[in-house]
Curated annotation (Swiss-Prot):
Keywords: Electron transport, Heme, Iron, Membrane, Metal-binding, Mitochondrion, Mitochondrion inner membrane, Respiratory chain, Transmembrane, Transmembrane helix, Transport, Ubiquinone. GO terms for cellular component: mitochondrial inner membrane; respiratory chain complex III. One of its GO terms (biological process) is mitochondrial electron transport, ubiquinol to cytochrome c. The cytochrome bc1 complex contains 3 respiratory subunits (MT-CYB, CYC1 and UQCRFS1), 2 core proteins (UQCRC1 and UQCRC2) and probably 6 low-molecular weight proteins. This is Cytochrome b. The lineage of its organism: Eukaryota, Metazoa, Chordata, Craniata, Vertebrata. Component of the ubiquinol-cytochrome c reductase complex (complex III or cytochrome b-c1 complex) that is part of the mitochondrial respiratory chain. The b-c1 complex mediates electron transfer from ubiquinol to cytochrome c. Contributes to the generation of a proton gradient across the mitochondrial membrane that is then used for ATP synthesis. InterPro entries: Cyt_b/b6_C, Cyt_b/b6_C_sf, Cyt_b/b6_N, Cytb/b6-like_sf, Cytochrome_b, Cytochrome_b_C_euk/bac, Cytochrome_b_N_euk/bac, Di-haem_cyt_TM. It is a multi-pass membrane protein. It is found in: Mitochondrion inner membrane. A ubiquinone binds at residue 202. Heme b b566 binds at residues 98, 197. It holds the Pfam family Cytochrom_B_C.
Length: 381
């Protein structure tokens, strides 16, 4: 009998166990496509970023001009830049949908995979933030100033920490240079953690919509799931192409078309749309340190989700109370995103505070209590 090289070769064997002969549950839906879409996003971002870095100059006197040069003079530079900028938005859309699927179907009970995923989200947010500073427009400069200033809220070490990150007494050339270094380095760290994320996932196997053990009903990843993923790739590339070619500045900020000016403050300083929900939570707390802790906890709370599981069922597919609350949480997050983009005035302050309280209450009290109630109702029958 002929030896199959993909099953015996040391290198091909790893690829085979990851992408070809991997046993996958037969009933996983399109919601399981977002993991592979995130991988595609990461590849697109690294490749476009590499080409942009070849033409970009990390100097405050030339950064803005170098971005203009990329868009005007470099062959297809405008396309590469637009793909990179909108690819970041698509990356966040995919990761938020990926997290939502994990919450809905109980995938968070794979604790190692879930916690590495939360760390990946943190790294992605950090990468996006430092990347947003690089064009050195008005919102880049003032966004960097405001967000890095948050560290001054920490007692004793705060001011020293801020000056250490700035590399001086204000956001200046040293800040831009180090942010460029971080923006170049972090995607490779994300890539390494993604491999560890997959490693832990393949220890347990994928979850499925029913949230039950599917060992008796598995199919090979290729061709069934691989073709399903390729369909997702085409859909996402089409969406990215429409965004990039027809409405490239839809998700950006008009202020960033103005070169950075430390003497003129924009009327409303805000980060990109994908960080607005956390920014809204930060702004809803009157105390600076409290706001910073709330900002961090808005993401870190995801790590508590496996510990707060009170339901006897894994997936919410047979739990109508939790399903309704899940969609309340989704709506709440959308409201927070909207509030983060609004000026600090009534009624937005009040709405933001109510949405922030309900965001944390959902995770810590309401959903665990609803799950406990569902257990009681089930035990009555």
């Amino acid at each position: 009998m002929a030896i199959n090289i993909r099953k015996t070769h040391p290198l091909l064997k790893i690829i085979n166990h990851t992408l070809i002969d991997l046993p996958a549950p037969s009933n996983i839906s399109l919601w399981w496509n977002f993991g592979s879409l995130l991988g595609l996003c990461l590849i697109i971002q690294i490749l476009t970023g590499l080409f942009l870095a070849m033409h970009y100059t990390a100097d405050i006197s030339m950064a803005f001009s170098s971005v203009v040069h990329i868009c005007r003079d470099v062959n297809y530079g405008w396309l590469i830049r637009n793909i990179h900028a909108n690819g970041a938005s698509l990356f966040f859309i995919c990761i938020y949908l990926h997290i939502a699927r994990g919450l809905y179907y109980g995938s968070y009970l794979y604790k190692e995979t879930w916690n590495i995923g939360v760390i990946l989200l943190f790294l992605l947010m950090a990468t996006a933030f430092v990347g947003y500073v690089l064009p050195w427009g008005q919102m880049s400069f003032w966004g960097a100033t405001v967000i890095t200033n948050l560290l001054s809220a920490f007692p004793y070490v705060g001011n020293t920490l801020v000056q250490w990150i700035w590399g001086g007494f204000s956001v200046d050339n040293a800040t831009l240079t180090r942010f460029f270094a971080f923006h170049f380095l972090l995607p490779f760290l994300i890539l390494a953690l993604t491999i560890i994320h997959l490693l832990f996932l393949h220890e347990t196997g994928s979850n499925n919509p029913l949230g039950i053990n599917s060992d008796m009903d598995k199919i090979s990843f290729h061709p069934y799931m691989s073709y399903k993923d390729i369909l997702g790739f085409f859909a996402m590339i089409f969406f990215l192409a429409v965004l990039t070619l027809f409405i490239p500045n839809l998700l950006g900020d008009a202020e960033n078309f103005i070169p950075a000016n430390p003497l003129v403050t924009p009327p409303h300083i805000k980060p990109e749309w994908y960080l607005l929900f956390a920014y809204a939570i930060f702004r809803s707390i009157p105390n600076k340190l409290g706001g910073v802790l709330a900002l961090l906890f808005s993401i870190l709370i995801l790590m508590l989700v496996p510990l707060l599981q009170t339901s006897k069922q894994r997936s919410t597919i047979f739990r109508p109370m939790t399903q309704i609350l899940f969609w309340f949480l989704v709506a709440n997050s959308i409201i927070l995103t909207w509030i983060g983009g609004q000026p600090v005035e009534q009624p937005f302050i009040m709405v933001g505070q109510i949405a922030s309280i309900s965001y944390f209450s959902m995770f810590l009290i309401i959903i665990p209590f609803a799950s406990w109630c569902e257990n009681k109702i089930l035990s009555l029958n």
